[in-house]
């Protein structure tokens, strides 16, 4: 059975919600799915004072586990147009896997969130995708089979490079049903692609 890892970092819960939607989509395709997060680097007192969501159910991933999956779908909120340092720090530890070619041929994808419509969604996706390409992975985005990314009647995320959500400047906007549908769609397509490639 196809094994999929949804790997994420979420400070305020928006990416956590998107990760769970991605996982739902991958499960719809018949995959076995694990949802894991990367370690928090912000000191506890600072995270609490900043109202980080610290009660996330997903277990902490270990870098050596990445080799166990047919597909890895990575999500993180943006930090000035690039992935959050927590995710970058985690992926930077994959040098041993890269050197052994342990991730070559696996399927990868990316999803993100920004505070505003023009807050760096696509550049953040590119920073994730660049890492995955260096690992030797085959990238699957959010293709236009998901027509919801072309909606003009509401504020919505979505890009051919990956599922996205817009949180609002104060973080009060949760992922919309359309954005969650995009995440589920991408998860399903990635799982289907991994099944075709890895059986």
UniProtKB/Swiss-Prot annotation:
Family assignment from sequence similarity: Belongs to the WrbA family.
Residues involved in NAD(+) binding: 12
Keyword NADP carried by entry: yes
InterPro entries per UniProt: Flavodoxin/NO_synth, Flavoprotein-like_sf, Flavoprotein_WrbA-like, FMN_Rdtase-like_dom, NQO
Alphabetized GO MF terms: flavin adenine dinucleotide binding; FMN binding; NAD binding; NADH:ubiquinone reductase (non-electrogenic) activity; NADP binding; NADPH dehydrogenase (quinone) activity
HAMAP family: NQOR
Residues bound to substrate: 98
Enzyme Commission designation: 1.6.5.2
Cofactor note: Binds 1 FMN per monomer.
Protein name as catalogued: NAD(P)H dehydrogenase (quinone)
Assigned keywords, A-Z: Flavoprotein, FMN, NAD, NADP, Nucleotide-binding, Oxidoreductase
NADP as UniProt keyword: yes
UniProt-annotated binding residues for FMN: 10-15, 78-80, 113-119, 134
Catalyzed reactions: a quinone + NADH + H(+) = a quinol + NAD(+); a quinone + NADPH + H(+) = a quinol + NADP(+)
GO (cellular component) term, any one: membrane
Flavodoxin-like domain: residues covered: 4-190
Signal peptide span: none
Cofactor(s) in the UniProt record: FMN
């Amino acid at each position: 059975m196809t094994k999929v890892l949804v790997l994420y970092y979420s400070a305020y819960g928006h990416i956590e919600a998107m990760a769970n939607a991605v996982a739902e989509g991958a499960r719809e395709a018949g995959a076995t799915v694990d949802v894991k997060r990367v370690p928090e680097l912000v000191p506890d007192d600072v995270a609490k004072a900043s109202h980080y969501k610290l009660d996330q159910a997903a277990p902490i991933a270990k870098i050596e586990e990445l080799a166990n999956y047919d597909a890895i779908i990575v999500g993180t909120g943006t930090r000035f147009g690039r992935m959050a340092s927590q995710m970058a720090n985690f992926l930077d530890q994959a040098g041993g896997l890269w050197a052994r070619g342990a991730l070559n041929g696996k399927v990868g994808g990316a999803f993100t969130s920004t505070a505003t419509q023009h807050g760096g969604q696509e550049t953040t996706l590119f920073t994730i995708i660049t890492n995955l390409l260096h690992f030797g992975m085959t990238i699957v985005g959010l293709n236009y089979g998901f027509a919801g990314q072309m909606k003009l009647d509401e504020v919505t995320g979505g890009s051919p490079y990956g599922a996205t959500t817009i949180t609002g400047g104060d973080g009060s906007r949760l992922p919309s049903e359309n954005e969650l549908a995009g995440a589920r769609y991408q998860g399903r397509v990635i799982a289907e692609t991994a099944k075709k490639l890895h059986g």
